[in-house]
Amino acid sequence: MSLPHSQSRYELVKQDTGYSLERRDGVPIKAPDAREVVVKVRATSLNRRDIMVLRGAYPVGGRETLVPLSDGAGEVVAIGSDVTRWRIGDRVAALFFQNWMQGRPSATTGSSALGGALDGMLAEYVTLPEDGLVDFPSHLSFEEAATLPCAGLTAWRGLVTQGQMQSGDHVLLQGTGGVSIFGLQFAQAAGAKAIVTSSSDAKLERARQLGAAATLNYRQQPEWAEPVRALTGGVGVHHVLEVGGAGTLKKSLAALAAGGHIAIIGGLAGFGGDIPAASLIGRAARISGIFVGSKADFMQMNAFISEYRIRPVVDRVFNFDEADSAYVFMDSGSHFGKIVIRH
């Protein structure tokens, strides 16, 4: 297909406090440089980070305007003269960090994040380096693939790359947002036993239908560390996807098995508080900060998703002209799994 001359996209525009979300029409489409690819975006998805950016509570380098959202999938519609990896029509998803290919992140990894330091995916077309894309499992739709770059990869790196999850392990998943539900699906496929917490009995029932071995309502049992240990027969959990921060970290550690791993992926209750080092040492336990993952992690995750025919859980799909409503729904916290915008 021939490229149109212009497109529509959304921009965050700096205000006195935070940003406003505004649609822009008639925006030129950047022609690809020699090693770049133009992607027609078919779907994007939201993460908690996107709400933080909107509120001005997430560092974006002082930018006055930016295109939001890190997560998106689409098809290649134009390629630069030196591109060898992609062909017109290929289905691709974007990397959250455009320059983190493998191994450890570098000092410049953070400056390559889409929807933050770099313009993101909430546009009809994006132009990205050919190395900043991956293909995705053939059984997934664009809407499903758009959920993978942040939430899927964060769960994968926390449980598998860093956690080395094995069959029979006990896994504690806090809440039923995108990362936790991916964690549930990965654990179930790997033969691990997932324990899911939520304040909603209806969401806990949905988690059981997805394969959760046990569930716990933390509003009814606010001191949940010992009840969680009891659900493991007293062993404790081998993995935690920690999203609560200061509000839950000590409880997660109290529920942890010897040799266990806590993957800190968020801090809904803030990040203050002391790390109980003596308890970590005594249990030979580990705590890791998880900030999405590399391209190599993404490709390994995609192979696992393909092998086990995993389908991401999409709660609601909004149209492109309903992007503001998608933000409102994300901010409400009432979703189960992922929120997607269809382009």
What positions do the PLM features span?
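NAD(P)H dinucleotide-binding glycine-rich loop of Rossmann-like/cofactor-binding domains
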Residues: F97-Q174
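N-terminal Rossmann-fold NAD(P) dinucleotide-binding loop
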Residues: S180-I181
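Glycine-rich beta-strand-centered segment in the early N-terminal region that forms part
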Residues: P28-T44, A57-M101, A117-D119, P137-H139
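Adenosine-nucleotide cofactor-binding segment
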Residues: H170-T176, Q188-K251
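C-terminal capping/lid region of NAD(P)-dependent oxidoreductase domains
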Residues: S2-Q7, G234, R309-V313, S325-H343
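Glycine-rich phosphate-binding loop and adjacent beta-alpha segment
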Residues: T109-S111, A190, D201, R208, ...
